[in-house]
Amino acid sequence: MHKLEKGYRDLYTKNFKNLTELMKKLRGKDGCPWDKEQTHDTLKSCLIEEVYEVVDAVDSGNPENLQEELADLFFLIIFYCQISDDNNIFSLNNVMEACFEKMTRRHPHVFGGKSVENAVAVL
């Protein structure tokens, strides 16, 4: 493994842990009253707004704005997962596992024995 790769992985792990711990604190006993009251349903309008803001950022061609809006959207995904975890429905880890399984299943040309000639053949 390249030294830079390990450092990047360590930083990624640290940042991910910091973000998930932040969300737990916001919804915890001494957390934010607004965050603690949120449900999947009450966050729907925020989710829709953030998706539109990501689309606008893509359209603007401004990478800094896109990064900011993706951060907001990513945080909402963490938020939804924490609400589910708090209610013993599923965890962030369950979502990540499901994502991994789904994407590997959808790409047999990469992770299986299937071969394709071009991008059109993938669809």
Predicted regions and their residues:
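Flexible "arm" and connector segments at domain edges
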Residues: 1-69, 75-123
